Swiss-Prot record:
Subunit structure: Homooligomer and heterooligomer. Core component of the 7SK RNP complex.
Organism, scientific name: Xenopus laevis (African clawed frog)
Descriptive protein name: Protein HEXIM1
Family: Belongs to the HEXIM family.
Alphabetized InterPro entries for the sequence: HEXIM (IPR024872)
Length: 285
């Protein structure tokens, strides 16, 4: 068999026609053949081919690569984190913080209710426990129970016949209730309530002092000193007034005693005149 020859220009992708000047034909691109296994050689060949075909793309790629390298060297600036909302459990809040929180919640609820009413949406009643506090604080409890009846008057009442006839078991129960439903007498119950009030007040005062800062404690101490000095001045002023009014009080007491003596004399004179009038009436026919 005869061997078939292949034209080198056709094998390289060329054309059999000669290129014309000023036409749309260009010189064939010379391509270099590289082994398949060498990846670096293949990439270099592609770079050369792309540079030969479009040199502007290579320049642009190199400039972009330089920009990325420069950007990678720069330090990444992080945005400053916003102040996080400091949350504290409700049981650890102070009295002032609890009051501010409740005021904010009530204002927010009122604002939302106003917006919903303006939009014509139905609004549920505002959930609050203020009515419970109002019912609780309507009047302060009476910490002074009524005085207990004296034990000396009880035997006299028992000896009275009218008391024996009218007394019933209900009256005795009422007397026991007046003496104290908890088994304590009037004075004992009053002492207990006074002691309990003092302990509660001292505990609350100690807790309030613990919650105060150093500056607040100093301020409170200075205020107490001012109050103490003012009370001492007032006490001294009252003492001077009492000493000044003592002679007038003594004079008033002596005048009262003199009037009492004159009253006794007038009573005796009246009795004497009554007796004389009776005798004159008896002697007359």
């Amino acid at each position: 068999m005869s061997e078939v020859g292949i034209c080198k220009s056709l094998a390289g992708g060329g054309s059999l026609l000669a290129p014309k000047e000023g036409g749309g034909w260009h010189h064939p691109v010379e391509r270099e053949e590289h082994p398949v296994g060498d990846a670096n050689t293949v990439s270099e060949g592609h770079d050369k081919e792309s540079a030969y075909q479009n040199p502007g793309q290579l320049v642009k790629a190199e400039a972009q690569e330089d920009d990325w390298k420069e950007l990678g060297k720069k330090r990444h600036r992080r945005l400053r984190s916003k102040n996080k909302r400091r949350w504290k459990p409700y049981d650890k809040l102070t009295w002032e913080e609890k009051k501010e929180l409740e005021e904010r919640q009530s204002q927010r609820a009122s604002r939302i209710r106003a917006e919903m009413i303006a939009k014509g949406q139905p609004v549920a009643p505002y959930n609050t426990t203020q009515f419970l506090m109002e019912d609780h604080d309507q009047e302060e409890p009476d910490l002074c129970p009524p005085p207990r009846k004296s034990s000396a008057a009880l035997p006299l009442a028992l000896n009275n016949s009218s008391y024996k006839g009218d007394s019933t078991d209900d009256d005795l129960e009422e007397e026991e209730d007046e003496a104290g439903s908890d088994g304590m007498g009037g004075y004992d119950g009053e002492d207990f309530l006074q002691k309990d009030f003092s302990e509660t007040y001292e505990r609350y005062h100690a807790e309030s002092l613990q919650d105060m800062s150093k500056q607040d404690l100093i301020k409170e101490y200075l205020e107490l000193e001012k109050c103490l000095s003012r009370m001492e001045e007032e006490n001294n002023h009252l003492r001077v007034q009492s000493l000044a009014s003592a002679p007038a009080a003594d004079h008033r007491d002596t005048r009262i005693q003199e009037l009492q003596v004159e009253l006794e004399k007038l009573k005796e004179e009246n009795q004497r005149l009554l007796q004389e009038g009776k005798q004159v009436a008896a002697d007359s026919p």
